[in-house]
Amino acid sequence: MLLTQTTTPEDVKALDRAELPLLCGEIRHAILESSAAVGGHVAPNLGVVELTVALHRVFNSPTDKIVFDVSHQTYAHKALTGRAYTYIDPARYGEASGFANPDESEHDLFAMGHTSTSVSLGCGLAHARDLAGDAYNVITIIGDGSLSGGLAFEGFNNAAELDSNLIIIVNDNDQSIAENHGGLYRNLAELRASNGTCERNVFRAMGLDYRYLDAGNDVLALVDALQELRDIDHPIVLHVSTAKGKGFEPAQSDPERWHHVGPFDMATGRKLCPGHPSKPAPRTYADITGEALSAAIERDSQVVGITAATPYIMGFTPELRAAAGKQFVDVGIAEEHAVTFATALARSGAKPVFGVYGTFLQRAYDELWHDLCLNDAPATILVFGASIFGTTSETHLSFFDISMLGALPNMRYLAPACMEEYLSMLSWSLDHREHPVAIRVPGIGLVSRPDLAPAEDADYGVARYNVVRQGRDVAVLALGDFFKLGERVANRLAAEYGIEATLVNPRFATELDREFLDSLAAEHRVVITLEDGILDGGWGERVACYLACTPVRTRTFGIAKGFPDRYDPNELLAQNGMTVENMAAEAVRLLNE
């Protein structure tokens, strides 16, 4: 097996040319086998195997600097830079990060996982090289989907002013996470159709040299093309056409659904339920969101769904997107534009709903502040994956959202504890015309709690906490999807200590029910808060601050500020004192002081 003997760039250079296609086949098979067991970014990685092998054949990493945009497509790169074990040894599957990680290897220059950064990083690397008088190559690889992010164009604009080596490889597979959208992609299609010769050329228009290679999955053709560009003395774009999902028919025929997947059956391509290989995946909040919004779109021509290249998180399948027509807009990987676009829609009488991962909403903070909230536009933002139990890579952490949105005037951030509350809040937000509304979609699986179901005419215009169980002395306020955890704490207080605690479902992540807190302070001696996010600037701190001038003892539970990486969620909770046993004991300790 070539791959077991080819684990460094030097090994790649030592192979005969005829062995390179064989190596590519082995890497592709290893990526598939390991991803079938632990999940991963399957389609993107299968499409760049040949390009990655060619890069390490031609260039001398880490002396030559190679930067993969997003870095979700670095599996082959990792296999060829000392980390093949994570793809060929079942006992070590998933051991290496799914993204670039400088702590793993000197060949990974930056910790990264968000899109459109590579060209800017390349410009910085090239400028630093020139200042130092060095002469190495700087190569960035950016997928065509990442070109829809504004930062990419800021980088291209700056790159055109360099007068030294910078090789920008545009990996064009005619696909973002879902299909591409926007005028840029019409030009890329024209360039592909004309073999790079059409007169209209967005890269040349920005002042960059340009070459095109149609054979983006031919490793020998790629080696030859890169050899010609090695040590070039000016910035150049190499535009290569590749097939996303190359070599695995399910991924190649449906690259959107195979962009990132959990464990799957390699023989059939069927997705598997973790822990229950024979069961299909369960229903999700994405499913019910797609159903609810599709029904709203059918009823009301002013409802507009918006996504930044991730329609699947809102449950919008290709069929639902087609049915919605102009009432569903994919703006590409452009969260900043999505927020400002939604602002104008809302101020013009439409009812926009922007669904976005919490980790990606961070990119649009100024637009949330300056455009949405300053203009008090009644748009709805659905924040997905904002949980300790969401993506655990340090590059995709999503639990800073409560602190982030809580600082914004006019923003109402709702935190449902179950699907019944979520659907009620979503329905209310569509007709709410006074302020921006964000909803923190629960991140710990679909939970049905009919006992928490709001009234049909529920109004979330004023912060009102929901007392689920009335008690005395101790109050447990558990926000959003941590309500169930708070319920367990209250149950333990009763069973272990004989304390009947008041159990509260707050529902509002950035606003306080001051009237309720005043009454709470009059009847309780201890208040503990639980939230699925960081403590600094969080909801619990607001509660504690409000109660600080009362006799009530307050203890906030959440996660310490930091960048935990590939953590076990339950271990992280334990490290932060958030076990049921500890939280109950802490409440009792405060009560007895």
Q: Can you name each region flagged by the protein language model?
A:
Residues 1-79, 204, 215, 219, ...:
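N-terminal amphipathic, basic-rich helices that act as targeting or association modules
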Residues 38-40, 64-67, 110-111, 134-149, ...:
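A short, small-residue-rich loop immediately preceding and capping a beta-strand
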Residues 65, 248-362, 367-377, 477-480:
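Non-catalytic terminal/interface segments that mediate subunit docking, oligomerization
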Residues 108-264, 270-278, 282, 286, ...:
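Glycine-rich ThDP/TPP pyrophosphate-binding loop and its adjacent helix/strand module
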Residues 266-275, 390-392, 412, 534, ...:
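Peripheral docking tails and interdomain loops at the edges
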